[in-house]
Amino acid sequence: MQRLGGILLCTLLAAAVPTAPAPSPTVTWTPAEPGPALNYPQEEATLNEMFREVEELMEDTQHKLRSAVEEMEAEEAAAKTSSEVNLASLPPNYHNETSTETRVGNNTVHVHQEVHKITNNQSGQVVFSETVITSVGDEEGKRSHECIIDEDCGPTRYCQFSSFKYTCQPCRDQQMLCTRDSECCGDQLCAWGHCTQKATKGGNGTICDNQRDCQPGLCCAFQRGLLFPVCTPLPVEGELCHDPTSQLLDLITWELEPEGALDRCPCASGLLCQPHSHSLVYMCKPAFVGSHDHSEESQLPREAPDEYEDVGFIGEVRQELEDLERSLAQEMAFEGPAPVESLGGEEEI
């Protein structure tokens, strides 16, 4: 029996051994089939995603156009409502305020109307005023304005007004276009219309509102290509300058009333703004004609106006008057002897 059991065990083992490598042929060739079969669904999914993105973009554009049309319809409806007020039917003294909310599409239109009528019993004069404020909100009835001032948007964003809405926009990096300092990220300033890291407040090209905002040697003036005034260096010899129709008045206004931006800056110290070649263009020229060396010494560097600040205001006015008188005398000398004699008579007086 033991021998028979051993024979049966050997037979079973011999039958089981060849069955082990049997699955190997299926493993070697089966991966070749699913490859192309798996690629088609992936390509189809990619195309579906592209079509879905295009559809979403078209829907978003249609939604924006629909919202714009609804806002225009709301404004027209508010205008019609205000025009329906009959002044004659109102009592002599009338005051009324109404606030209404109307659903227009997916938006809520808020209309606040104030009507006031006052009649003077003695003169019979009637004063009528009407104020209509219209705003459009979203589906939840909230106002579309996201912010009012820059501080409402946080440190890395600023408040921008566009398309009749105030929204928070991300700050702009270095060398990007700007119109305000708050549009630039971090400690950057808007200089010459671009966000700049190295700019200092009141420095060359920084935004200004009046002359006090600029550092010495600079003046607040408008520049071509910019919609706002910037701190500009005082022009030197040969550069365009502020029209000196009344040089003394300009000097006093700039020294005593440093408010408001100019179209062009006045000349640096030692220079006069004079017409160039009998034209309407004014350029900075030396104050003492024929003394070129003296004018070069008296020219004020753009960034170092220390000598200009040390001179007192009275002395500066006196110097401007003397320079103006000398310049007029030399210009009149070319016209004939009569003007020279009359000018000499004035000097003797």
UniProtKB/Swiss-Prot annotation:
Residue ranges, annotated region (DKK-type Cys-2): 208-284
Glycosylation sites: 96, 106, 121, 204
Disulfide bond sites: 208-220, 214-231, 219-265, 241-273
Signal peptide: 1-22
Gene3D superfamilies with a match to the protein in the record: Lipase, subunit A
Description of how the protein assembles with itself and partners: Interacts with LRP5 and LRP6.
Similarity-based family: Belongs to the dickkopf family.
Domain of life assignment: Eukaryota
Record protein name field: Dickkopf-related protein 3
Compartments, record wording: Secreted
One Gene Ontology term, aspect cellular component: extracellular space
Transmembrane segments: none
PANTHER family associated with the record: DICKKOPF-RELATED PROTEIN 3, DICKKOPF3-LIKE 3
Major localisation: secreted
UniProt remark on domains: The C-terminal cysteine-rich domain mediates interaction with LRP5 and LRP6.
Keywords: Coiled coil, Developmental protein, Disulfide bond, Glycoprotein, Secreted, Signal, Wnt signaling pathway
KW Transmembrane (keyword) present: no
Tissue distribution: Highest expression in brain, eye and heart.
Gene: Dkk3
Example of a GO biological process term: Wnt signaling pathway
Organism per entry: Mus musculus (Mouse)
Annotated segments matching region DKK-type Cys-1: 147-195
Coiled coil: 39-84
Role: Antagonizes canonical Wnt signaling by inhibiting LRP5/6 interaction with Wnt and by forming a ternary complex with the transmembrane protein KREMEN that promotes internalization of LRP5/6. DKKs play an important role in vertebrate development, where they locally inhibit Wnt regulated processes such as antero-posterior axial patterning, limb development, somitogenesis and eye formation. In the adult, Dkks are implicated in bone formation and bone disease, cancer and Alzheimer disease.
